[in-house]
């Protein structure tokens, strides 16, 4: 799945402008060209594109462009969208499903695609799960584990309305099932990880960085 990220275009006349500002400072003092920074509240998940924005802020590149970046952390893209009004963020980076559902309802605009992180989404089950006993039930998807008999009635922990939720739905479709054939428990990633580690659920669907744990 994909995520948005901000891309910065540099002015080819930046050096000339810098020289102009230095001259202005020499002539009339620093107060003549110093402008208050524009606050920019943004929302992010613990993913790759967030590091890029964090690094830019650490280096002071936001202030160099007249911005004062604020990074709000969230556990899922659905939470980012749900709290859009209360958090009052202007720009965010989320997965495909939250972005698409929000844009279709005219709640936001998609301004760019950052990268393809579909490989970071995964469904995990325990080593002794019957789901792992069959592979290739659907001849069109020979590498996919599970069959209707081993999956029907099982409990899956997943943050609803996310890319992982969509992936789970598509996996069920490959096996000839749908969400009504299983039990879905809605939990945010950190809570879901703890619950699964404590023995709850038969499988869990998440994305990076949880999938690396």
Please tell me what each predicted stretch does:
Residues 35-179, 183-188, 202-209:
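Short, glycine-/small- and polar/acidic-enriched structural segments
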Residues 7-8, 29-31:
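N-terminal compositionally biased, intrinsically disordered segments and leader/signal-like regions
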Residues 186, 193-198, 213:
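A residue-level marker of the well-folded mature domains of exported/periplasmic proteins
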Residues 7-17:
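Bacterial N-terminal signal peptides that target proteins for export
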Residues 16-29:
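Bacterial N-terminal signal peptides
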Residues 1-6:
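Short, Lys/Arg-enriched N-terminal segments with co-localized hydrophobic residues
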């Amino acid at each position: 799945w994909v995520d948005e990220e901000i891309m910065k275009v540099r002015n080819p006349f930046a050096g000339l402008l810098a020289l102009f500002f230095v001259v202005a400072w020499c002539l009339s003092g620093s107060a003549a060209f110093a402008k208050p920074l524009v606050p920019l509240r943004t929302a992010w998940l613990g993913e790759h594109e967030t590091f890029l924005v964090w690094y830019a802020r650490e280096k002071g590149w936001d202030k160099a462009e007249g911005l004062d970046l604020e990074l709000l952390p969230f556990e899922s893209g659905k939470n980012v969208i749900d709290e859009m009004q209360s958090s009052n963020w202007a720009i965010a980076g989320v997965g495909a499903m939250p972005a698409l559902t929000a844009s279709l309802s005219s709640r936001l605009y998609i301004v760019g695609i950052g990268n393809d992180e579909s490989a970071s989404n995964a469904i995990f089950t325990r080593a002794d799960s019957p789901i792992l006993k069959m592979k290739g039930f659907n001849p069109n998807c020979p590498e996919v584990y599970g069959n209707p008999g081993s999956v029907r009635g099982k409990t899956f922990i997943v943050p609803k309305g996310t890319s992982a939720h969509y992936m789970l739905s598509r996996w069920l479709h490959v096996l000839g099932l749908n969400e009504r054939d299983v039990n879905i428990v809605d939990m945010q990633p950190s809570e879901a990880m703890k619950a699964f580690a404590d023995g709850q659920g038969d499988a869990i669907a998440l994305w990076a960085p949880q999938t690396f744990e």
